[in-house]
Design a protein with these regions (language model features):
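Conserved nucleotide-sugar donor-binding
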Residues: 101-102, 171-182
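Short, flexible, basic/aromatic active-site loop/helix in glycosyltransferases
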Residues: 149-166
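A conserved hydrophobic position in a structured secondary element of the catalytic/binding core
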Residues: 59, 107, 174-175
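Short beta-strand-to-turn element immediately C-terminal to the catalytic PLP-Schiff-base lysine
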Residues: 32, 147-150, 174-175
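Residues that recognize and position ribonucleotide moieties
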Residues: 30, 105, 166, 172-173
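N-terminal glycine-rich phosphate-binding loop and ensuing alpha1 helix
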Residues: 3-62
Length: 184
């Protein structure tokens, strides 16, 4: 289904968790199969006819620009949003405010989301959200019996090898342009 919204891709980070790979390449250009992770993410949005991409760059930005500009066969627009210093997600969103004036996606450049972007957009619109953060469900198991005690140290319960489920930020968002006013 066609949704055709602008997409802000966060490609300015150092990628310290991916070192030593990111000593050579920015994380956006790490290969996943035959393409870079950045191309994989762009392709996932192209399936929904999102054809306008704003890429927030800082670390090794020249490599990212050169690489994307060298792709001759792309049928989408790419605009670069320059972070002169590391600003983080909110800072990059604020910089993009001079280019974006409609509902838009924000995606980290180091995640691959296997979900229906049109359904996420429907949820966002039906909920009348200014910001929708897409969560991933994570599970942790503790391989021991966990003791629950009262304030005096008396045993109340033993939970044997409990499992916990929680939601984490997946790095994919939908925002309304009204959020720009909240960012200093």
């Amino acid at each position: 289904r066609k949704i055709n919204l602008p997409v802000l891709l966060m490609a300015g980070g150092i990628g310290s968790r991916l070192k030593p790979l990111t000593n050579v390449f920015p994380k956006a250009l790490i290969p996943i199969g035959e393409k870079t992770i950045l191309e994989q993410i762009i392709d996932s949005f192209l399936e929904y006819q999102c054809e306008k991409f704003y890429i927030s760059v800082n670390y090794k930005s020249d490599m990212i620009k050169y690489y994307l500009n060298s792709l001759n066969n792309h049928n989408y627009e790419v605009h670069f949003v320059e972070e002169k210093e590391f600003l983080g997600t909110a800072g990059s969103i604020k910089l993009a405010s001079e280019f974006i004036d409609s509902t838009f996606f924000v995606s980290n450049c180091d995640i691959l989301i296997d979900d229906d972007y049109a359904n996420i957009l429907d949820f966002h619109k039906e909920s009348k959200n200014e910001i929708t953060i897409v969560a991933a469900i994570m599970q942790s198991s503790i391989p021991y019996g966990v003791l629950e005690t009262n304030n005096e140290g008396q045993l109340i319960e033993i939970n044997e090898k409990p499992e916990y489920y929680y939601k984490i930020n997946s790095g994919l968002y939908i925002l309304e342009p009204s959020v720009f006013k909240y960012i200093p």
